[in-house]
Design a protein with these regions (language model features):
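Short, solvent-exposed loop/turn segments at secondary-structure boundaries
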Residues: 20, 46, 82-85
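Acyl-donor binding region in acyl/amide transferases
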Residues: 27, 51-88, 92
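Phosphate/oxyanion-binding active-site loops and adjacent basic polyanion-contact surfaces
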Residues: 48-55, 114, 118
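Globin-like tetrapyrrole-binding proteins
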Residues: 78, 82, 86-174
Length: 174
């Protein structure tokens, strides 16, 4: 029934965006937790990299707005299974009384509900950006985009004026 089982996972966003500190292109980590029954997103976090902090933040949002699930189901990634999450005394799930179950390593089909969510939502969103880097993108186009953006950032760091082409590629970076 609703709110019994939450399913969590993290993925890098499949498009490059401007890093919030230095502005260079990077792919942020998006952590999402959905309700297994309703497929409703109960928590999320956007971070610089996969981490227990990102997972904890997504759990915090879910618990704050929807209460406690009985089971939290995730993969075996470092962000999902670190001591911050799983330690039997100090871990978030044990302190909140949530049973944390993990899938079989290398078997994403076991988390098909959330894997489908990624495909239908986040990957489709990333495809809307010219900086998309996911599967199906032509590798020569991806390499050209990367080289042109690197050229622009290198020129900026050296205090050089940007060419029209460098300016054009910088504008593509969300």
């Amino acid at each position: 029934k609703p709110n019994d089982v939450w399913i969590g996972d993290g993925h890098s966003f499949k498009a490059k965006v401007a890093h919030p500190v230095h502005g260079r292109p990077f792919k942020p980590e998006v952590t999402v937790i959905i309700d297994g029954c309703t497929r409703f997103v109960v928590g999320f976090s956007v971070s610089l990299a996969e981490s227990c902090v990102a997972v904890s933040d997504a759990l915090r949002i879910g618990v704050k707005h929807y209460g406690l699930p009985i089971i939290y189901y995730s993969d075996n990634g470092g962000g999902q299974t670190g001591k911050t999450i799983d330690h039997e005394i100090t871990g978030i799930t044990s302190r909140l009384g949530i049973r944390h179950e993990t899938g079989i390593a290398g078997n994403p089909q076991g988390r098909g509900i959330i894997e489908r969510w990624w495909k239908d939502n986040l990957i489709e969103m990333a495809r809307q950006y010219e900086t998309f880097t996911g599967s199906g993108m032509d590798s020569s186009t991806k390499n050209l985009m990367y080289r042109k953006m690197e050229s622009a950032f290198n020129a900026l760091e050296k205090g050089k004026d940007l060419t029209e082409e460098q300016q054009k590629y910088l504008k593509k970076l969300p």
